[in-house]
A protein has these predicted regions:
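C-terminal segment of classical bacterial N-terminal signal peptides
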Residues: 25-34
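Long, charged/polar, surface-exposed segments that mediate recognition or autoinhibition
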Residues: 79-135
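Short, ordered beta-strand-loop transition motifs
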Residues: 68-74, 108-114, 140-148
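Short helix/turn-capping signatures at newly exposed starts of structured segments
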Residues: 34-97, 110
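C-terminal partner/receptor-binding element of secreted or periplasmic proteins
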Residues: 129-155
Length: 155
């Protein structure tokens, strides 16, 4: 490297530093996120209801108290505050509804039924459905978006 042009070494150093920071951040998130993520597998067996699924998550501070979105059918979507998993997949949002329950905001259409609950996870429909069925759950599995899949129980 030329003494008159220190730029190549500087760019290389900045790149290495950025790469190291990114790897450390990913490693810290990966290790702490996976190790400390709360599993919702047992609750997604479809033997519960919207209130019994969502209320403990609210009480523990695992999800935000106000829904980020309410569907016309009254299904409420709650953001997570802490890492959650379902059948080994990271939870993107928690879903829930229970008729006449103040936890849930009503939508502007016909409610989905008396209750519904579930999650949207990061994963393909095929992989998620295989894990759900292997665990013995009767939950409905539907693709929400590419690589986002809903796991839902309802009455």
């Amino acid at each position: 490297m030329s003494a008159t042009n220190p730029q190549p070494r500087m760019k290389n150093h900045v790149f290495k530093t950025a790469l190291l920071v990114a790897l450390l951040a990913f490693g810290a998130f990966g290790a702490s996120g996976a190790a400390s993520a709360k599993s919702l597998d047992d609750s997604l067996d479809c033997h519960s209801n919207g209130h019994k699924f969502v209320a403990p998550l609210l009480a523990a501070g695992d999800i935000q108290s106000e829904p980020m979105h309410v569907e016309a059918n009254s299904v409420n979507a709650f953001r997570t505050n802490h890492p959650l998993t379902a059948y080994g997949f990271g939870v993107y949002v928690v879903l829930g509804y229970q008729a006449n329950d103040p936890i849930f905001q009503p939508g502007d259409g016909t409610p989905i039924g008396n209750w519904a609950y579930g999650v949207v996870v990061r994963g393909t429909k095929g992989a998620v459905e295989q894990a759900v069925r292997k665990a013995g759950s009767d939950a409905t599995v539907k693709q929400a978006f590419p690589f986002l899949t809903a796991i839902v129980c309802s009455d």
